[in-house]
């Protein structure tokens, strides 16, 4: 018997889901898979798609990125099979999915450390406090805090040039909430892009730059970028696998997800096979592309959730700040 309390959390067993699947949009073909969403998650998914496609003929997989918000919109309209996400689904997106009878399985696949970066030729900036980051990025700083010596007097009297993910980005949502205190609250006089490679190029070419994006994009260009330590009151901490696993890199550590359309997974054997392959290879692939893999227990819980058809989210549409890997495991187990 299924637990009625799960309905309040948006979690429904697949057996109940199947009673109402006929109204959902079918997959493009039985052998096609459409993926869209986070540019942060994209390198993991792209690598897994390449590995899966290398040994699987006749499956057409289209993987793109438009930001977490843009990806959820497409997903909840039934236009894609999988949404890559760098934050949990929010209440507005949950409503859109519900309105379109899109049920989903939420699968954590890695941890990220949002990395604050500058140009490596910048020899005076080594760390910033959370309060300094807030002063730099908050809306009130627009056209008022524009030079580095306004952050600290010992910094040079030179312009601050800011590089930020776009407003559809889950990284933008998470950073602004964690640092400024409200998701989406940010000054507008910045260079924004949903493409993290454009942000990387901007920082690389600009001595007085400051930007942020997912850890893998820093790791991939580590010789061309300088990570800035984040001081949350206990001294500066640099992003790394070790500082994330020890819950030291706060508040900019966060989980990464894929969301799978449960109805399409029922109808499309190739999609089911791909998700199984994804979970089996997520740890090694996350490490390879530069993210922090989850403990094996997390992937096992994901396999259970997917195979049992546990649909919904354990986050209730709420933002999650300062989540540790251990706390994520506890949330995953709450599906049981």
UniProtKB/Swiss-Prot annotation:
Keyword Signal tagged: yes
Annotated keywords: Signal, Transport
Taxonomy, superkingdom: Bacteria
Record-level Gene Ontology MF annotations: phosphate ion binding
SUPFAM superfamilies assigned: Periplasmic binding protein-like II
Residues spanning the signal sequence: 1-27
InterPro entries, alphabetized: PBP_domain, Phos-bd, Phosphate_ABC_transporter
Keyword GTP-binding: no
PANTHER family named in the record: PERIPLASMIC PHOSPHATE BINDING COMPONENT OF PHOSPHATE ABC TRANSPORTER, PHOSPHATE-BINDING PROTEIN PSTS
Family of this protein: Belongs to the PstS family.
Functional summary from the UniProt entry: May be involved in the system for phosphate transport across the cytoplasmic membrane.
Name of the molecule in the record: Protein SphX
Name of the gene encoding the protein in the UniProt record: sphX
